[in-house]
A protein has these predicted regions:
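Beta-loop-alpha module in the N-terminal Rossmann-like domain of NAD(P)-dependent dehydrogenases
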Residues: 80-112
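A short hydrophobic/small-residue beta-strand
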Residues: 119-120
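Alpha-helical segments flanking ligand/cofactor-binding loops in enzyme cores
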Residues: 45-49, 86, 111-112, 137
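Short beta->alpha connector loops at strand-helix junctions that form conserved
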Residues: 59-60, 123-125
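N-terminal Rossmann-like dinucleotide-binding module
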Residues: 1-56
Length: 149
């Protein structure tokens, strides 16, 4: 069985850390393709070193600069903001998107993931409360699954 490649939004929060713990327990079933965080750059750096993702997303351009300096010798793609999150969830190698982003900030990348036929695991219910009907319609059209964590 081939492992599922995960795009993890909110990797440094509690949902993200729980997801990474699961990936550690089942390395033959899951691999991290991409990570995303808002502010906790130090935690993200540790996660990059451990999981070797192909892409990461941070919130601000100064954080992008900091990561590019730290990982100058790697092929890591470093993106920023909501647009970066939307870009990484649609990557062809991503099988599963796990989101721990709270509130409305996760709406755009979650919707984009569903549009691209990615299965989506919600670690929070805010996005479903805010746009659940729309998510269900898009998932039905694309064949995506929406799963609770």
């Amino acid at each position: 069985m081939n492992p599922k490649f995960i795009a993890l939004l909110g990797s440094t929060g509690s949902i993200g850390r729980s997801t990474l713990s699961l990936v550690r327990q089942f390395p033959d079933r899951f691999k991290i393709h991409s990570l995303s965080c808002r502010r906790s750059i130090d935690k993200l750096v540790d996660q990059i070193k451990e999981f070797s993702p192909k892409q990461v997303v941070v919130e601000a351009s100064d954080q992008v600069t900091q990561l590019r300096e730290l990982f100058a010798e790697s092929e890591l793609e470093i993106l920023s903001g909501d647009q970066g999150n939307c870009q990484l969830v649609q990557h062809p190698e991503v099988d599963l998107v796990v989101t721990g982003i709270v509130g409305s900030a996760g709406l755009s990348p979650c919707l984009k993931a569903l549009e691209y036929g990615k299965d989506l695991v919600f670690g929070n219910k805010e996005s479903l409360v805010l746009a659940g009907e729309l998510f269900m319609q898009v998932a039905h059209r694309s064949g995506s699954l929406i799963l609770p964590m």
